[in-house]
Amino acid sequence: VLNQTLTDFEFLIIDDGSTDRTVEIIQGYTDKRIRLIRKEHQFIQNLNEGLELASGSYIARMDADDIMHTERLRIQLKRMKKNPDITVCGTWAKIFSDKGNERNVSHLGYGIIHEPILELLKYNMILHPSVMIKKEFLLNHHIKYQNYPCVEDYKLWFDIAKAGGILFVEPQELLMFRRSDTQVTVTKKEEMSLGSIRLRKEILLYLLSAYNNK
């Protein structure tokens, strides 16, 4: 993050009860852009606190074990300023693991997601740790992360789309997404699957209601 070509940003780091040397390492940096917040095991609340504490017009999301392309913030900010209607800008990513395996992720669509609610019924095309979000839209529509374990991002995109937000996927690999045996997509696979089913039911009911009210 500190190697970004775009340098004018604040760096909020929310430590969610780490047990390694994370805090010690962060405190070793003297960069004034860094702000460390320590909250133990309050994941959803921590996500929302990050949204509230961020003072900028745009919020870029990132997970601790992934790697950000040095041009990511510059490219996303340029895209969103050039197209001010965009609410959420995700990117393509490259998946890697500690075993050295690597593959591209380019099946997440690209450009503006037309009929976003209908598309979200099919799958979640926005990679959470790759996003940049327009904060003003969230404030104006009172949108925040909800308690949807393992699919809180999926729910957020749905709420944004319902409010008329524009979802966009930048067709560049601006994130290195780490795959490991300890991440949520592996350790809570069943919970994530059930959460996705729950949310798809909610989306389907919304679409049926909208259709019946025409």
Question: At which residue positions do the language-model features occur?
Answer:
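Conserved donor NDP-sugar-binding/catalytic core segment of glycosyltransferases
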Residues: 71-103
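Conserved nucleotide-sugar donor-binding catalytic segment
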Residues: 52, 69, 109-200, 211
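A conserved acidic beta->alpha catalytic loop
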Residues: 15-24, 41, 63
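The conserved acidic donor/metal-binding loop of glycosyltransferases
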Residues: 63-67, 92
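Short, acidic, metal-binding catalytic loop of nucleotide-sugar glycosyltransferases
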Residues: 1-8
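Acidic helix N-cap motif at the loop->helix transition within catalytic regions
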Residues: 20-28, 67, 71
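Short aromatic/hydrophobic "clamp" motif used to bind/position activated sugar donors
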Residues: 59
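Glycine-rich, basic loop-to-helix element that forms the pyrophosphate-binding segment
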Residues: 38-54, 75
